[in-house]
Each structure stands twice: as structure tokens, then as C-alpha cells.
Amino acid sequence: MLDLDTVRNDPRRVKEALRAKGIGSPDLVDTLLEIDETRRSAITELQDVQSRQNELSQQIGALKREGKDEEAEAIIEKTGRMKEKINRLKEEVQEAEARQEELVLELPNIPHPSVPVGADEDDNEVEATVGEMPAFDFDPAPHWELADRHNLVDLERGAKVAGSGFPFYLGKGARLQRALLNFFLDRARERGYTEMQAPLFVNPESAKGTGQIPDKDALMYEIPRDDFYPIPTAEVPVTNFHRDEILAADDLPRRYCTYSPCWRREAGSYGSDVRGLNRLHQFDKVELVRIVPPDESYRALDALLEDAESALDALDLPYRRLLMCTGDMGFTQAKVYDLEVWSAAQERWLEVSSVSNFEAFQARRAQIRYRLEPEAKPELVHTLNGSGLAFPRIVAALLENNQQPDGSIELPEALHPYTGFARIGAEA
């Protein structure tokens, strides 16, 4: 959530952010300022009327003691009318504040000055490409064929049991999932993250705290009867762990890692891009979250990015780092990098991680603050998160990039202690 003072003092900057991100209309800023002016005028008038009412009320007792009952009754009648006006003005202020809060939640975060201005994914900047793309002397099979051949994933039965995009993992496919879970969590713990097991459902306040509401409301599954949302990412419960709290300076920085299933409706996803494990409604992910003082957040972003990239390095997967342009950023992000792995059979890049700095945007919504000194005024923290990493496309890349002429798949050495096997297929 943006600070209202920013909207009041620099509306042009906020409008530019709306245009740059392609989210909402700049007219929203004007509407918000009009409501803000109405609210402030009503507050001023309310204070004036209350002050006058208090002055008159003090006169009533004196007039009665002096036997001036008629004058006292006239003032009582007048203060009664003033009370009606006070109640009306209070309602006006409350209505304006409610509408103001509703509208300010629709304003996206302002991009950091270092973010390139652009309309869509074509304007993202490739900052680095790491690793060598595999070369084959045969036609590599896509991961969905390999998974079917080796009985690793069953999408058809998943569709029968739940619906499209809800896979079963079988045998070595299930063991590979579990191996990735432990591999990613162990690496995060070694890098100073505190492991956490978080709730898989959140309430609307938590979804609002991290910005999923109202921006991604339509992309989340919902359980209306109990007022819950199955989490679209563990960012939501982990960041809200400190919602409505004031931390001490010594408590920062905080680093958390957690594994969770995630659920996303992914409305409007069709075609070849969604085949196999490319896009699912239920998937597994390890999430990395950092909560830091404001002056440390961009150093923390670099460190978080390195944490995610190091896992890809360890898996020997070729990948590239993208700095996302304004038009391809999310609603809540001030700056974001995407990490994409190379898919050898599909011959395209697959996103496996977004690493983001939200600055104070989420902290203001969730009221996560800290004190530099015990008696100091609380200040907002900065929040960051990144996937470390999302499993499905990692599995897709591992299968496609490491397939052998005999149809088997050789797994990277870093996973062998976790899987208990080095190869899938060819009767390893």
C-alpha cells in the first residue's frame, strides 16, 4: 500500500507508476484526492462544530444558576441541533475514510528508478545467461513424454481425481519431488534462513497484507464457507507471520524459508505453454522471505537473488536472469528479477523463480514495523521474497536437459544423496 502522503504530495509520480505498470487508471489518483479533500473538510467542520457545542454547553449551567431558564433552553435546543450535525459529519468522515482505504489498496507499488520502462515481456532486460545449453545428436523428448515413459507423473488420473493441472507423482517422480524439497531447504538453512512450516490456508486480512487482495483475488482459490484462501505462494503466510507487530532493531534482518504446496487458478492459460508440468493449478515450491531495515533492502535483494541462483548452479541447469520492465512487473513489486531455466526439448526458457523487493508496500498493508531504539517511533520494514525454487519446471528441465540416447535421465550429482539414485530409466 502506498503512503497517502505520497499520493497527496506527488500525485504525478503515482500516476506515472499506474501508466508504467499498465495497472488501473490514473483517474483513480484524482478520485482518491477528491475523497481525501472531502474527508479533511468534513473533519475540519466537525472539529469546529464540536468546539462551538462545547462552548455553548458550558453556558447552560451558568444561565440556569442566574435564573435565565429561557436562554438556557434555547441553547439546549441549539446544541441538540448541533449534535445532529455532528453525527452527520462523523458518518461523512467514516464513509470517506472507508472509500479512501478501498481505493488506496488499488494503487500499485511505484517501480524503483533502476527498473526499465517497458510495455511487456519483450522489454525485459536479460542481465546474464549462465551455463551451457545441452547439445544432442538425437531429437530430445519433451518432459511430458519422458515422465510418461518412466511412469513419473500421471496427469490423466490427476485430472480424473481433481481436475486438469493437479498431477500425481509416482515412484522416482515422487522421490525426486521429495529430494528437491530437502535439497532446497538444506541450502537455504546453510545460508542463514530459519526453516518454517506455515499454514496452507490464510484469511482475507493476510491475503490483503501481501497484496493478493484485491490484485490477484480472481487467481486464488477460495473457501467462502470458512473465509479461507488456499495459499498461491508461501510468501503470504510467512510475510504475515509478523503482521501487526513492532520488532526491535536487533530482531532484524529476518530470513525465513518454507516448503509448501501452492494453488493457483491460472485463469486464461491455454495451448502448448501449459502442457505437462509447464503450468499447474497445484505445485510445490520452497519460498525465501527476508524482512529488513529499509537501508538494507537492495543489498538484501542482491543476496536473495544469489541464493536462488546458487541452487540452479548446483543443479547444473542453464539459466538466465531477467530484470523485469515496468509493464511486466507485479502489482506489489518495486523491483523484480525472474530466473528462467532452459528447456532443451521445448527450446524455450521456463520461469522458475521471481525475486522481488516490495520496499515498504507490503509492510504498510500488514503493519510490520520496527524501532531503531526502544523509545523511538516505529518505522516500516522492507519485505522481500523469492522462489527458491518452484519444483515443476525444475523437474521439466532436469528431465529434458539430462536425457540420454537410451532414453534414461542422469540426475545432477548434487541430488544423488537426496534421491538415493543417480539415474532414471535404463534399469538404473
Curated annotation (Swiss-Prot):
Its source organism is Salinibacter ruber (strain DSM 13855 / M31)
HAMAP family in the record, alphabetically? Ser_tRNA_synth_type1
The text the record gives for the protein's domains is: Consists of two distinct domains, a catalytic core and a N-terminal extension that is involved in tRNA binding.
Q: Which residues bind L-serine?
A: T233, A234, E235, E287, S387
Q: Which Gene3D superfamilies match?
A: Bira Bifunctional Protein, Domain 2, Serine-tRNA synthetase, tRNA binding domain
Which CDD domains is this protein grouped with? Answer: SerRS_core (cd00770)
Classify the main location.
cytoplasm
What highest taxon heads this organism's lineage? Bacteria
Alphabetically, which GO biological process terms does the record hold?
selenocysteine biosynthetic process; seryl-tRNA aminoacylation
| Membership in a protein family | Belongs to the class-II aminoacyl-tRNA synthetase family. Type-1 seryl-tRNA synthetase subfamily.
Q: Please give the function described in this protein's UniProt entry.
A: Catalyzes the attachment of serine to tRNA(Ser). Is also able to aminoacylate tRNA(Sec) with serine, to form the misacylated tRNA L-seryl-tRNA(Sec), which will be further converted into selenocysteinyl-tRNA(Sec).
Q: Write out the GO MF terms.
A: ATP binding; serine-tRNA ligase activity
Keyword set includes Aminoacyl-tRNA synthetase: yes
Q: What class of enzyme is it?
A: ligase
The protein's UniProt keywords, in alphabetical order, are: Aminoacyl-tRNA synthetase, ATP-binding, Cytoplasm, Ligase, Nucleotide-binding, Protein biosynthesis
The pathway to which it is assigned is:
Aminoacyl-tRNA biosynthesis; selenocysteinyl-tRNA(Sec) biosynthesis; L-seryl-tRNA(Sec) from L-serine and tRNA(Sec): step 1/1
* PANTHER family (UniProt xref): SERINE--TRNA LIGASE (PTHR43697:SF1), SERYL-TRNA SYNTHETASE (PTHR43697)
**What is the name attached to this protein's record?**
Serine--tRNA ligase
Which residues does the record give as ATP binding sites?
Answer: R264, R265, E266, E351, V352, S353, S354
